[in-house]
Amino acid sequence: MRGRHYNPSVSDARPVRFGFAVLVLAACGVALVVDHTRLDSPTMDEPFHTLAAAEYAIAGTYYANLEHPPLVKLFSGFALRAAGARAPKMDVPFSMAMAEQPRPFSFHSPLAPEKLFGVARAPVAVLFFLLVVSAACAVRVWAGDLAGILTAAALAFEPNLLAHAGVVHTDLAAALGFFATLVLAARALERGSLGLWAAAGVALGASLAAKFSCVLLVPMVVLLALVGLLRERREAARAGRPPGLVALRGLLLAGAASAVVLFGSYAVAMRHMSRPEAAKAVRIFLVSRQAPEETIGRVLAISRLSKEAGHYAAGLAGIAVQNRTGGGVNYLHGRLSVDGFWEYFFVAFAVKSSLGFLAILAVACGVAAFRRVRPDVVLLTLVLPPAYLFLTGMATSYNIGIRHMLPVYPLLLAAAVLVLFRALPARAAAAVLLAGTVLQLGETLRVHPHELSFFNEAAGGPANGAAWLNDSNLDWGQDLGRLARRLRERGDEERATIAYFGGGDVPYYAPRATVFVPAGAPVRPGLWAVSSFLMCCGPEATAFHGDPAGAAGLFRLRQAVSTRGMAVDRVGYSIVLYDLKEQKR
């Protein structure tokens, strides 16, 4: 069955109404993000990213966080600079031992921690707004106004996107980067436009400067250009003329544009850093990742030629080493592994996606099969990259969250919308999408403001999330502030002992509580607040990172909670309060 093409006379007649509807939906999604982030404590990685953001934007050096590219942190950093934040204290020549650490920087700053993280998170919420709007506009081009509006509605209330739109991290930016790059490249292919190829290159460069996994976009864009070249050759042969090579010229233009954006981002972040200091930062980072000396030598050679390229190469090399050696302990449905699970992201997608979203995809797959929807370049551009991401995810040893698969959500949704509007009458397609979106909205509102801990009802909901997954899927440290408020409400702050996993500072939030120090601290009877992550894999993760004494302490805690602890309350879905009884003799 041939796909129906976009009819400008239908869709362009109401651009104001379309734009208003999409902007309102995107704004509603952002409102949910703002509402949950005002209550969320810093997640595990946020103090690191916030310190790095301030370093890049205010100090103009790049000693911290080489394992991530700088673009998102530059956005956060310039927002912090405008709000009056300071740069972290880092002496030159640089020494890791003397550098200010993330938690002291975050909680002993001119800005209160709530304001510091609120300002740093704001640019990520803006990226979420842009993702919703850009997805709606792209679908509108191919399927009309109604399809675009329903796409915006489904994305604006998708719980995983909402969760990570409120975190200083790179995952939401990767979702926007994948979608924008692929859609612009597909449009450039359709229209034979060098301008669109240049725009795709800018989007590609921004994606590469946002997250290292976006390097997977490079072969995808090259493949689209090859499709364009084959099409040009075929059309030129029919017409008896030489091919115009627009796709090849477009690919070269996109490559140049992406390089300018990528290395320009690094240049801004390290504008006050000398080449020797850049090389020193590269060596310190790669040694900390236990990279082979041969790898370090090659990256340092690149750094001597270009400090920007050297930092990018160091980040890629560090990720590669981590994937080979393991980045930590992974948890899946009761099992632990440092090597990862091939099925991890398939399970995570199944239990972390809303039932409404999954229903839309299932109906679209059924319609595509029974109506024999013919896949064109646009549909393949939207469907094959998610398949590629899932396949590459099977080989990774770093299984820490569905957040690494955020790019598949807008791509798969856009593909589903196109299939439904091509194969069904518009009212039937709209009914399917509206039903799925309303179901998803109900699921999201039911768990709000705990979107980070979302699990669908088929998996048992967030209360059963710990049986499936942990880490950034459930417990990333976001509920520490809520815990402090709960303890004060109960009148239990002074008698509570807190065993916490995350980026928050326990003495800041609960100054009268006792902080559990695993190495050597006894596990006494009383009221305990314990992070879910520590119960599932705290001892194993601590041992993996070279702290046997801490691992032994966490193992004692887990044993004590399992054998003589009674759950008396829960904070969000990531922290449980236990009444720990005396040990029977």
Q: Which sequence ranges carry the predicted segments?
A:
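Transmembrane alpha-helix segments characteristic
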Residues: 26, 150-151, 361-365, 373-394, ...
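C-terminal luminal/periplasmic domains and tails of membrane-associated envelope-modifying transferases
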Residues: 7, 290, 294-301, 305, ...
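Membrane-interface transmembrane helices that cradle and orient dolichyl/undecaprenyl
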Residues: 181-197
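Transmembrane-helix motifs of polytopic, lipid-linked glycan transferases
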Residues: 122-142, 180-184, 369
